From Swiss-Prot:
Coiled-coil annotated residue ranges, if any: 95-247
Region (Disordered): 276-308
Localization, UniProt: Plastid, Chloroplast inner membrane; Plastid, Chloroplast outer membrane; Plastid, Chloroplast thylakoid membrane
Name of the protein in its database record: Membrane-associated protein VIPP1, chloroplastic
Major place of residence: plastid
């Protein structure tokens, strides 16, 4: 039975590993009631469950990062609303001036250190030369031991001078670097100051334009224009009324004078008709047209008689008499 199961299942009948491993002990079962049968041995593999603790920690960290990002974005937006370009530019220039002051102080300190090294180097060189001269003098006097000691002193000072020379060269490179950086920062500050003035002017112009736009936005132009239109119509109405009244007054006065002139001409025409009809005597003036009357009317300044008309009428009378 075991051999058949091995053939079908392909599993060996070797003893299995203990429960501490990933394999489980084979199960021995008896089938078909109380009848003894050969035991069937199965190999059951235990599947290791994944550890979930790391995943939970990763999710928590992801949420924390997202929350921190949101908080930073809101904080940056809040800070941006309170930023004034003019004040920020002033602060930036002040900080650059502070950096320039610090660089100048550092340069001064390095220059002082360089000066001290130069003095030490010169002193060591002078001492080395002095001991060399003494060694020559001792050797000339036949004092070899003294000359040897002088040369030892000379070598000590020469080595010290060489060391100081190396330090001095290094110090000079540092000083040159500081000086170049200081000059570069000075040029940057000068450029920043010019840009600051330009940006401040632009910011002021932008603020003014914004205020003007806000003022224009708050003004109700439609109501103002309608009020102007109403006032214009009212003024035009008043002008029309004044013009109409003036025309009425002028027409009334001219009508009165026209009536007066018409009555005077009608009277003269009636008299002329009478003269032509022979109702008046030959050589006499029509009634009311004597020279005395005309002279009197002229002298009295009758406003209803026209001198030109009277002259023309007199000429007509003479012609009618000749006929």
């Amino acid at each position: 039975m075991t051999t058949k199961f091995q053939i079908f299942s392909g599993l060996p009948s070797a003893p299995l590993q203990p429960s501490s491993s990933l394999l489980k002990k084979p199960l021995a079962t008896t089938l078909f009631g109380t009848r003894p049968v050969d035991t069937l041995k199965f190999r059951v593999m235990r599947i290791a469950k994944p550890v979930r603790g790391g995943g939970a920690i990763g999710v928590r960290m992801n949420l924390f990062d997202r929350f921190a990002r949101v908080v930073k974005s809101y904080a940056n937006a809040l800070v941006s609303t309170f930023e004034d370009p003019e004040k920020i530019l002033e602060q930036a220039v002040l900080e650059m001036n502070d950096d320039l002051t610090k660089m100048r102080q550092a340069t001064a300190q390095v220059l002082a250190s360089q000066k001290r090294l130069e003095n030490k180097y010169k002193a060591a060189q002078q001492a080395s030369e002095e001991w060399y001269r003494k060694a020559q003098l001792a050797l000339q006097k036949g004092e070899e031991d003294l000359a040897r000691e002088a040369l030892k002193r000379r070598k000590s000072f020469a080595d010290n001078a060489s060391s100081l020379k190396a330090q001095l060269d290094q110090q000079k490179s540092v000083v040159d670097n500081l000086v170049s950086n200081t000059r570069l920062l000075e040029s940057k500050i000068q450029e920043a100051r010019s840009k600051k003035d330009t940006l401040k002017a632009r910011a002021q112009s932008a603020k003014t334009a914004t205020k003007v736009s806000e003022m224009l936005g708050n003004v109700n132009t439609s109501s103002a224009l309608s009020a102007f239109e109403k006032m214009e119509e009212k003024v035009m109405t008043m002008e029309s009324q004044a013009e109409a009244l003036g025309q009425l007054t002028t027409d009334d006065l001219e009508g009165k004078f026209a009536m007066l002139e018409t009555s005077s001409v009608d009277d003269d025409l009636a008299n002329l008709k009478k003269e032509l009809a022979g109702s008046s005597k030959k050589g006499e003036l029509p009634p009311g047209r004597s020279s005395t009357t005309s002279t009197t009317s002229t002298k009295t300044g009758n406003p209803f008689r026209d001198a030109d008309i009277e002259i023309e009428l007199e000429q007509l009378r003479k012609r009618s008499k000749e006929l």
